[in-house]
């Protein structure tokens, strides 16, 4: 899972256009990552970069700043799907340091970065009150983090528990002899 529909806390200053919305910069607001909006946004996450830390990316800043390129440790695949309440995707991480962090659980959780339009109307989602909803979500990147805001169930995970190489080897004549 790379994200999920849920209610999360955000400081006012983290909310786009907070001043125009009359929000206090240091007050905590609870925002709903709206499931309908997250489903609509699925395609915008396809083939986005996976970064070793959160840095807003644009075509201009990534082309002009070679240091930003060093933060790129992988990519989201082209299969992104909303399976309530989760946004799921295949991931490819190619950086050895990032892989080591994942394997040791140091940076196994994920945090999506996106642009969105906040609609500050209160409501309730699955028993959780919220102050506003995220709408018009557009994926920007995915970051490997120690603790993600979406929760400990939004993590890098291997969804295939079988080692097909070993299975194929066991089924071959040599494999049968070796594993007998």
Model-identified regions with their sequence ranges:
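A glycine-biased structural micro-motif
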Residues: 12, 20-56
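A generic structural motif
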Residues: 87-91
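Acidic, gly/pro-rich intrinsically disordered regions characteristic
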Residues: 1-16, 21-24, 72-82, 94-108, ...
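A broadly used, surface-exposed interaction patch
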Residues: 47-84
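Extended Gly/Ser/Thr-rich low-complexity repeat segments
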Residues: 38-54, 99-116
